[in-house]
């Protein structure tokens, strides 16, 4: 599996900063070309929430300890927040992988912890797509 290219295809946030629930879909214009040049929108539309959520997601996925400041980014009216990221991974073997990662963060007082997470994947090879299987829950 050489020459893997990983692209974010969608990001769903729930109770992150000012976003109660929202999904951003990233159009994949070409697997080998850059697709996103910037994020724009009205003030308060969730642009910073997207960037912050991607940072939290990165920290969680590499196994870093959750920073205490993350509690400030979770909606104060809710005891949990959720981030779901969908990725498209292409390989030189002409296989296409659709990978999803979901994490639910729980909050009490100023503490935040991972309450639940799961990872799923499907493979498309030779035009045949497998069902999405959950690998971790």
PLM regions with names:
Residues 1-56:
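Pre-Walker A-like glycine/lysine-rich segment at the N-terminus of P-loop NTPase domains
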Residues 14-16, 86-92, 120-122:
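A generic structural motif
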Residues 20, 93-97, 128:
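Short acidic/polar mixed-charge low-complexity motifs
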Residues 38-40, 51-110:
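Conserved P-loop NTP-binding catalytic core
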Residues 102-137:
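Electropositive, glycine-dotted interaction segments
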